[in-house]
Amino acid sequence: MKRRHWSHPSCGLLLLVAVFCLLLVFRCSQLRHSGDGAAAAAPDGGAGRNDGDDVDERLVELAAVDPAAMAVLQAAKRLLEGNLARAPERHRDVALRGLREWVGKQERFDPGVMSELVELIKRPIDRYNGDGGGGGEGEGRRYASCAVVGNSGILLAAEHGELIDGHELVVRLNNAPAGDGRYARHVGARTGLAFLNSNVLSQCAVPRRGACFCRAYGEGVPILTYMCNAAHFVEHAVCNNASSSSSGAADATAAAPVIVTDPRLDALCARIVKYYSLRRFARETGRPAEEWARRHEEGMFHYSSGMQAVVAAAGVCDRVSVFGFGKDASARHHYHTLQRRELDLHDYEAEYEFYRDLESRPEAIPFLRQRDSGFRLPPVSFYR
């Protein structure tokens, strides 16, 4: 039988196809091995992605626009022009001094404030406790561990009381109850710092009588408050009047200091939450982030007290544990009230996204990440 011979053109075409297939297989093999190596090198198992690359610079620009803060600042300047007329004469000078200092710090955005929080928050507390006034062992040291206890009704579904009380510092929000038989096993009994927004301060202080009923945890527990209304410097002056910080000297009979958050910390928290809210809006609606303001009352939008308490704790603690943040359909909004609805001026879902990043990938957080703030965040854990 005669053997069949392929023509030269057919042989050439077959050879070209074979070479092409070999090259394709080789290239795919290279890509596969390269991808495996990148995944092994990436801390999150991804293909070598840097968390910081997730930051959307356009959202960063939009987050810097804060009409609510601008309105508060303008109102503060008008109060200064009017010499804070609502303040009783005996407290006016102190209130004006605090207001002037606060307004003077409003002009610049500085994430580096995170590195100053030990000096701004912990140092006054140490001085009050007699631990930080003379270069002692505790001076300049961060708290070894901090528990930030929120007010969510989900706290009643667990018994974290002993775990909470085991932290060096326990922070509670807006005078939520603790320590009695009803709540202690859920929320703990100890309190080392009360974090109040100034609306709460304004409701429990009576300037005309020079009375302050804001110390829900006792005279010896310091208060950290952020000013959402500049007029509340009057209530601050009243409540801080009996503290040692008002005289600048330690006094065993004096009440603990009432510390006002640095405006740079306020601005940092505002930008972080607005960034996450913008991102969530664009993702869920498919609309440009520039339309965010149409769906929110931009002049009222604000971060929650709990969010700022967590960020403040991250600045003064080596390890932060967070309890009572989150919601459940069967739980109250607050464990100690009958309120079931969230406040519209907060975007809690956006804050929850921030908390997830804070716990698992802090370098993905704009403004707060180390490359922006120069500050290395401590480990933060959230308990349900």
Curated annotation (Swiss-Prot):
* Subcellular compartments: Golgi apparatus membrane
Q: So which residues have sugars stuck on them?
A: 241
Taxonomically, the superkingdom here is Eukaryota
Transmembrane intervals: 6-26
Q: What molecular functions are annotated in GO for this chain?
A: sialyltransferase activity
Q: Which organism is it from?
A: Oryza sativa subsp. indica (Rice)
Q: Does the keyword Phosphoprotein apply?
A: no
What does the protein in this record do?
Answer: Possesses sialyltransferase-like activity in vitro. Transfers sialic acid to the glycoprotein asialofetuin. The transferred sialic acid is linked to galactose of Gal-beta-1,3-GalNAc through alpha-2,6-linkage.
Any one cellular-component term (Gene Ontology): Golgi membrane
Know the name of this protein?
Sialyltransferase-like protein 3
The main enzyme category here is transferase
Q: Does the keyword Repeat apply?
A: no
Q: Cite the ranges annotated as topological domain Lumenal.
A: 27-384
Q: Name one GO biological process term.
A: protein glycosylation
Q: Which family does it belong to?
A: Belongs to the glycosyltransferase 29 family.
Keyword list (alphabetical) reads: Glycoprotein, Glycosyltransferase, Golgi apparatus, Membrane, Signal-anchor, Transferase, Transmembrane, Transmembrane helix
Please give the residue ranges for the topological domain Cytoplasmic. 1-5
Topology term for the membrane: Single-pass type II membrane protein
- EC number of the protein: 2.4.99.-
Q: Which CDD domains match?
A: GT29 (cd19952)
